[in-house]
Structures are given as C-alpha cells and as structure tokens.
Design a protein with these regions (language model features):
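Short secondary-structure boundary/capping segments
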Residues: 5, 41, 68-69
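N-terminal helix-cap/turn-to-beta initiation motif at the start of protein domains
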Residues: 1-14, 93
Length: 93
C-alpha cells in the first residue's frame, strides 16, 4: 500500500455516521447528524490517524483512532476502526 500523507488526508471526509474536515495545520472539525459539532486536532502516525476533539457543550476530550488500510482512489479510503476492529469507508466531499 502506498504511504498516506498529511497532504492527501487534508480536506473534507464523509463517514456514514459523521463527517470531518482535516486541515494542513492539524485542526479538526467533526460533525454528526442533528448539527452536533466538535473541534480539536488530528495527527498522522504512519498509516494511523488520531482524532482528538471536544464536542460542543461538553468538556470531555474524545479520541477516535483509525488506520488507513487502502487508498481506493483520490476520493475514497478504506479505514479500520482501532477500537471496533471494523473496516469502514471514508469519501472526500
């Protein structure tokens, strides 16, 4: 598999349950249905992506970790949720 880069991941990505924007400066905006939002940062470690955020209206710091298993094309990646050990798809939008 080709190496995942920060430049490739920067942008807006859609998951079936949430969407996010990853900036080149490691800022993160994450959104869920019902207009729930979170703000934080993201980090690339090898092929592993670590999202750290605080949901609006809360003080709890949350983490979501996934690995990029395959770059299908420039707009689609297969990921593996580190906690659930489940393959999922992220699409650029």
């Amino acid at each position: 598999m080709e190496k995942v880069t920060k430049e490739f991941l920067a942008g807006r990505w859609k998951h079936e349950e949430w969407s996010c924007e990853l900036t080149m400066f490691n800022f993160l905006l994450i959104e869920w249905p019902m207009k729930i939002r979170g703000h934080g940062s993201w980090k690339l470690r090898g092929n592993e992506v670590i999202l750290t955020y605080v949901q609006e209206g809360t003080r709890d710091r949350m983490f979501y970790i996934f690995s990029v298993e395959e770059i299908v094309d420039e707009n689609t990646i297969k990921t593996k949720d580190a906690e659930a050990n489940k393959i999922e798809i992220l699409k650029r939008y």
